[in-house]
A protein has these predicted regions:
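Non-catalytic regulatory/interaction regions at protein termini and inter-domain linkers
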Residues: 1-220
Length: 220
């Protein structure tokens, strides 16, 4: 479903309280604090309904705990009873390199493995993350260059769609965008094409703009 086809728009903080189980939502944001508030609300609502929730980002765990506590999440309670899991992970940068020689690919794989092993292990290994009902992935993939964009899309196809999507987990995955409207309107630019492709891969989208303006709706 395209943006034009969607007839049901909601405020992001309301939308995340109504996400159906098993749906994957992409969150494009211009303002980090707004994106965090939306993500935390998604986690908070899950905990209220006794869901196991996991939050993955590059931020230090104690900082995330403090920020969650500030909006009223009982962090100590839910981490103690294993309903809330907070992980600090390394952002992925080069999941896929299509045109490199074999030796360079193997070298990159070896170097990459140490950096991303904690991320992929947490996502794939139930003993590490349990069977989380809700997961927030905050910027777990860098998209600063065209090669990283290509790599990210391969990760979206090969990992999230094939692994996480079929696990039944409900997910919010966030990406920073400097200017959402101008970027997605540029159909010829690499970032505009990338955003449009992601809209085809997710069940819903949240656009979180500056000054706490935003809109969210289902895509499927």
């Amino acid at each position: 479903m395209s943006i034009k086809d969607s007839s049901f728009f909601e405020q992001p903080l309301s939308f995340v309280n109504k996400v159906e189980e098993g749906k994957h939502i992409v969150l494009f944001y211009e303002e980090l604090e707004y994106a965090k508030m939306i993500s935390f609300q998604f986690i908070k609502d899950g905990l209220v309904h006794q869901k196991d929730c996991s939050y993955l980002s590059e931020e230090e765990v104690e900082l995330v705990k403090t920020e969650m506590s500030d909006i009223g999440i009982g962090v100590n309670k839910f981490t103690s009873n294993n309903h809330l899991h907070i992980y600090q992970v390394t952002s992925l940068t080069d999941y896929y390199h299509p045109r490199e020689g074999t030796e360079l690919i193997e070298d990159r794989k070896a170097k990459r493995k140490a950096a991303v092993d904690n991320t992929t292990t947490i996502l794939r290994n139930p003993s590490k993350i349990r069977k989380s009902d809700r997961i927030v992935l905050r910027c777990v993939y860098n998209v600063d260059t065209e090669e990283q964009i290509k790599s990210n899309l391969r990760w979206e196809y090969d990992f999230r769609c094939k692994n996480l999507k079929h696990s039944g987990t409900t997910l919010v995955s966030s990406y920073p965008i400097n200017d959402i409207i101008s970027t997605i309107s540029d159909s010829t630019g690499s970032y505009g094409k990338w955003m449009s492709t992601l809209l085809e891969l997710y069940d819903g989208v949240i656009f979180a703009r500056k000054f706490w303006k935003g809109v969210a709706f289902n895509l499927a």
